[in-house]
């Protein structure tokens, strides 16, 4: 059994995307809840070792993933709203498309969920986050009562 000999597990509750099904979010709140429930309640992982993975990037749905994944900071620079979870963006040679990401509202909900039933959150990757008041890491820290 692996659980007793590992300090923590990063549960990657993201990248659940489709290249053929449009309007599918790759990392919504429901997926976070489902993943934590599966590992803690179904597989028996100690909640004290379960760390919820949160993305600081967005993915489109229903189109190729090549050169269409954008950092959260890039999404905001193209007019994305830090409180929402989708935006219409443009990535170079592609026409405008909808990208799905976690805004501050969803990150706060996920941070609260992870604080309530697990050991916290981790982000993939910090450099993709916004460096200002729109920061996802700051939103999570504020939610769980930690300094940023």
At which residue positions do the language-model features occur?
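Substrate-binding surface in catalytic domains of secreted glycosidases
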Residues: 1-81
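Hydrophobic residues within beta-strands of alpha/beta enzymes
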Residues: 9, 121-122
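Glycan-binding loop/region signatures in secreted carbohydrate-active enzymes
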Residues: 47-117, 138-148
């Amino acid at each position: 059994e692996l659980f007793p000999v590992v300090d923590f597990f990063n549960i990657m509750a993201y990248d659940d995307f489709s290249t053929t099904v449009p309007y599918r979010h790759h990392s919504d709140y429901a997926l976070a809840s489902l993943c934590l429930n599966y590992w803690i309640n179904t597989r028996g992982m100690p909640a004290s070792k379960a760390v919820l993975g949160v993305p600081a990037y967005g993915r489109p749905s229903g189109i190729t993933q090549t050169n269409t994944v954008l950092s959260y900071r890039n999404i905001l620079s193209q007019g994305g709203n830090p409180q929402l979870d989708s935006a219409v963006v443009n990535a170079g040679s592609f026409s405008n498309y909808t990208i799905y990401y976690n805004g501050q509202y969803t990150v706060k909900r996920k941070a609260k969920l992870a604080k309530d039933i697990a050991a916290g959150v981790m982000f993939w990757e910090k450099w993709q986050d916004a460096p200002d008041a729109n920061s996802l890491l700051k939103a999570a820290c504020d939610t769980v009562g930690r300094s940023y």
